[in-house]
Regions:
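Transmembrane signal-anchor helices characteristic of membrane glycosylation enzymes that use polyprenol
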Residues: 7-35, 143, 241-253
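Extracytoplasmic catalytic/substrate-binding loops of multi-pass membrane glycan-assembly enzymes
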Residues: 28-45, 56-85, 297-298
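Membrane-interface anchor segments at the N-terminal boundary of transmembrane helices
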Residues: 97-110, 323-399
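Transmembrane-helix motifs of polytopic, lipid-linked glycan transferases
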Residues: 100-128, 166, 170
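Multi-pass, polyprenyl lipid-linked donor-dependent membrane glycosyltransferases
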Residues: 102-105, 139-171, 203-210, 417-419
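Specific aromatic-rich, kink-prone transmembrane helix
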Residues: 159-179, 193-197, 214-215, 427
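Membrane-interface alpha helices of multi-pass inner-membrane proteins
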Residues: 188-204, 240-245
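Membrane-proximal stem/loop segments at transmembrane-domain junctions that anchor or position
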Residues: 250-341
Length: 448
């Protein structure tokens, strides 16, 4: 009877997933509809680099988007529908020859990604209601406009969201299978996880910091838990993550992609303030009007700005906290309009619930993580420990990504921090479900 009940729950969960996919496929119009933005041309130019050349890593865009637009053969394609929200020229999507296959792929990849993540979480839950809740909420999270609308935009955001969902799903599998040393499927999962992480890391420079946090959490786990040290495959994966992190950071610095946003920071936040200029001068900054300034800036600006933030913790903290409301104030893309069909109205209502526009999400995540850590000392089963480890990694990663997005540019803060905001929103739903599920578990397997 128990087996039949379990199979029944799994079948029902798959039925819910199938329904959610149907809604996603039928509620957003033609999957070939697209709109370009101010950055689209740079992605097309990035894809013009020869395959696997140095330019694939060191141009103005990153390897994944360069490779994506290279394979899409978008060079020479004419952009017909473009939106500039800053100029109030938002428009409706259109089918653009050449770019239709790009957004079609983005849509399909997104559907697969969020479906995989929902199944990965559902698989590791024990309660039937929690399984149904997970498959419903996680797919709805990825299929509502805050995420799904980006699949029609010719940029890096869609790939960032989708590859993150795939990476997270595979990391969950790796974590819960780490003891199966000789399992061939586990080896394949490790390889897939590393490939997904590499492609995801090289969609945006800020993603590299998430990998750095993953490496740090993995190293700590390696030394704390003997069971982890016994797993050679995990050590290989940790080493690979470290190497990708180093390559990513080196790529970001040598490419000069940081120069434009850092120029905005200096022009808006440093140079207009005499006291801040004086501090920078103690670090060797010459007169901004001098010929030497450009050389100093190219060699020292990121490091000097980081030292400024560390030396002024009050400014760093207050400048961030004062903008929290604004950072969490959006849950919809600004580039195109959509017809207000009944389906769209319903999706927007769900969107506002699943992607709340309040910085209280950040505070709730802190409280949720504190609650999970407190519960860990009282309930030491291996599954719960793994979930808490994932929560810590995601929280620290989202915090690092948000800090980089916030402080690395003075323009477009909402867009630059959008991915971190969505990570915080997703964490709240996933780990609330995990907490509900763990509170009903009866097993207490200890970590050895």
């Amino acid at each position: 009877m128990k087996l039949l009940k379990k199979k029944g729950i799994n079948i029902l969960a798959l039925a819910v997933l199938a329904f959610m996919i149907f809604v996603r496929l039928t509620s957003y119009g033609d999957l070939n509809l697209s709109v370009a933005n101010a950055d689209t041309e740079t992605y097309i130019k990035g894809g013009a680099a020869p395959l696997f050349s140095k330019d694939m890593l060191t141009k103005s865009r990153l390897f994944t988007t360069n490779l994506f637009y290279y394979l899409a053969d978008a060079q020479g394609c004419e952009i017909q529908t473009v939106s500039y929200p800053a100029l109030r020229t938002e428009t409706y999507r259109a089918i653009q020859p050449c770019f239709d296959r790009i957004v079609f792929f983005q849509n399909i990849l997104s559907i697969i990604a969020w479906s995989l993540l929902s199944l990965a979480v559902t698989k590791r839950l024990s309660g039937g209601y929690e399984k149904l809740l997970a498959v419903s909420l996680i797919t709805a999270f990825g299929f509502t406009p805050a995420i799904a609308d980006w699949d029609s935009i010719l940029g890096s955001e869609s790939l960032t969201f989708s590859l993150f969902a795939i990476s997270l799903a595979l990391i969950i599998e790796v974590c819960f299978n780490f003891a199966r040393e000789n399992n061939k499927r586990t080896t394949f999962t490790h390889i897939l996880a590393m490939v997904a992480l590499v492609f995801w890391a090289f969609t945006r420079d800020a993603n590299i910091y998430t990998l750095a946090v993953l490496f740090a959490v993995s190293i700590i786990s390696y030394f704390v838990f003997p069971a982890v040290r016994k797993t050679k495959k995990l050590l290989v994966l940790i080493t690979a993550i470290f190497l990708v992190t180093v390559v990513g950071l080196q790529s970001a610095m040598t490419s000069g992609r940081w120069a434009t946003p850092m120029t905005n920071v200096f022009n808006d936040l440093i140079l207009p303030h005499p006291a801040r200029v004086e501090f920078m001068q103690t670090l060797g900054m010459p007169d901004p009007a001098s010929a030497e300034y450009s050389t100093w800036f190219n060699e020292n600006a990121p490091r000097a700005y980081a030292r400024f933030l560390l030396a002024h913790p009050g400014y760093t903290l207050t400048s961030f906290t004062s903008e929290l409301d604004g950072i969490f104030s959006e849950n919809i893309q600004p580039y195109f309009y959509s017809e207000q069909t009944p389906a769209r109205v319903a999706l927007m209502a769900a969107n506002d619930v699943l992607h709340p526009k309040t910085h209280l999400i950040f505070i709730l995540d802190i409280l949720l993580m504190a609650g999970l850590l407190f519960s860990l000392f009282r309930r030491k089963n291996i599954n719960f420990t793994l979930w808490v480890g994932l929560e810590i990694w995601l929280f620290l990663s989202a915090s690092a990504t948000m800090a980089v997005g916030f402080f690395a540019d003075s323009i477009g803060l909402t867009r630059h921090t959008m991915f971190a905001v969505e990570m915080f929103r997703l964490m709240m739903w996933v780990f609330l479900i995990v907490l509900f599920d763990q509170s009903n578990r009866k097993d207490e397997f200890q970590i050895s």
